[in-house]
Each structure stands twice: as C-alpha cells, then as structure tokens.
Swiss-Prot record:
This is Lectin. Keywords: Calcium, Lectin, Manganese, Mannose-binding, Metal-binding, Signal. Mn(2+) binds at residues 149, 151, 159, 166. It comes from Lens culinaris subsp. culinaris. PROSITE patterns: LECTIN_LEGUME_ALPHA, LECTIN_LEGUME_BETA. Coiled coil: none annotated.
Length: 275
C-alpha cells in the first residue's frame, strides 16, 4: 500500500513538473497581439472613447473644428499590453494613419495634433500649446506619456529656436526630445507611419504627402529617437489622438487608422479588422 502511495505521489510530481514546464514553455514562446484597422469612421464608432470635442462624422474622426480654444481627443477603447512585468518583454508595434489639418489661413494655424501612449485612465490635459496631452515643459515622470506631435504653432518656452513647424517626439514633457522641421501643407492629407522596435528601443516616425502639388517643397519626413518605453509608460496603456486650438485655430481630422502590436512571452490575442 505504501509503495502504491509512493508511486502515486511520484506520478503526480512528474505530472505537475511536466504541466509547469509546458505552461512556462507556452508563456515564453507565445505572442500576444493586438490589431485593428479603421478605414472609415462610423457615426457610432464603438471601439473609440471620445474626450473633449472629439467626434466622428462623414467617415472621419474630427478632433477639433476650426474654432478657438478647443481640445479634442479619441482613444482606442481596449487597453494595450505594451510590456510584460513577468518577462520584462516589450512589444513591437506599428501604427499608421492619415490626417488633415485644415485652417482658414495657412499662415495662422494652431496648435497641433498628436498620437500618444498614456496610462489607461488618461484624461485631457492642458490645451493650447500643450496639445491636450501634457501640463508642463518640465520632465514629469508621473505623466507616463509618450507622444508624437505635429506642431503648427511656435511656443518660445519649449519649441525649437528656429520657430518652424515641426514633428516632435515627446517623453513625459511637451518639450520634445527630438524634432524635425515640417512644412505643413494646409488641407492636404498626410500619411503617417510610427513604428517601435523593442530590440533597439528606437521609435521611428515617417510622414508623407502623397498627393502634394508643391513640387519644390519637401514632402517626406523621417524622425528617429531611442525611447525606453518600459521605463516611461505603464505595463497597460491606451493609445489615441489629441488636437488643440488656441487664439489661432484649424480643423484636425483623422481619416483612417490601423495598429498592430506583438508582445512575446504572453498568451492572448485581440484582433478587430475594419472595426
């Protein structure tokens, strides 16, 4: 009898060992993905959270109209697992979108537009030059926010001294860690691709104007920066857009948006095509 009990205990120990090894194997070798593609925004876009003046109409996402002093934001409704606390792994991701900034005058445009990554409970922040994403030009680690800005209005307290409109990468501050001068083509559709390589921590931004009639001007821009996402943002985040106006203004619209992330060492998948 004792021998049988010993055999049973040994069997269960072996079984438990195999089970735990299998779970660990799949945990380490599986990949968690999040994907969605919005080619046309519906009036009742259920996978978006609107904040401030953001809304959808006529197949597009409108963040602000061309009126003074507005803040509009839109977030993807499902939180994104951007890094894993257990494994330390960080997700690779790529997002692409098309947007239009349309102002009554191409000389008086404000304030700009951002794609951002922020805590799940993120709320609209200060408007105007802070673009609805930040509250300070000083580095604030409690912000836990990374943004790519398309800045149309010069703010002397933090913008590049050349006073040019620019694309910027922001980490916990409205003062960009890297910028690229940008020639806004008022009313023209811009295509943007933002990619993050977890192996190198490099965030790459590319903007092109595919239908530009301004042959003498630059119509393609690329910006890179090392951003240690795991050290900046929470494990779970929301992604979205924000735009603001001030004394000067413009309409800020998004016409399409797709996103795909892959996080190794986890075990779930979320996908929504043309959501």
């Amino acid at each position: 009898m004792a021998s049988l009990q010993t055999q049973m205990i040994s069997f269960y120990l072996i079984f438990l060992s195999i089970l735990l090894t299998t779970i660990f194997f799949f945990k380490v070798n599986s990949t968690e993905t999040t994907s969605f593609s919005i080619t046309k925004f519906s009036p009742d876009q259920k996978n978006l959270i609107f904040q401030g003046d953001g809304y959808t109409t006529k197949g597009k996402l409108t963040l602000t109209k061309a009126v003074k002093s507005t803040v509009g934001r839109a977030l993807y409704s499902t939180p994104i697992h951007i890094w894993d606390r257990d494994t330390g792994n960080v997700a690779n991701f790529v997002t692409s979108f098309t947007f239009v900034i349309d102002a009554p005058s191409s000389y008086n445009v404000a304030d700009g537009f951002t794609f951002f990554i922020a805590p799940v409970d993120t709320k609209p922040q200060t408007g105007g030059g802070y673009l609805g994403v930040f509250n300070s030009k000083e580095y604030d680690k409690t912000s836990q926010t990374v943004a790519v800005e398309f800045d149309t209005f010069y703010n002397a307290a933090w913008d590049p001294s050349n006073k040019e409109r620019h694309i910027g990468i922001d980490v916990n501050s409205i003062k960009s860690v890297n910028t690229k001068s940008w020639n806004l083509q008022n009313g023209e559709r811009a295509n943007v691709v933002i990619a993050f390589n977890a192996a190198t921590n490099v965030l790459t931004v590319t903007l092109t104007y595919p239908n530009s009639l301004e042959e003498e001007n630059v119509t393609s821009y690329t910006l890179n920066e090392v951003v240690p996402l795991k050290d900046v943002v929470p494990e779970w985040v929301r992604i979205g857009f924000s735009a603001t106006t001030g004394a000067e203004f413009a309409a800020h619209e998004v016409h399409s948006w797709s996103f795909h992330s892959e996080l190794g060492g986890t075990s779930s998948s979320k996908q929504a095509a043309d959501a």
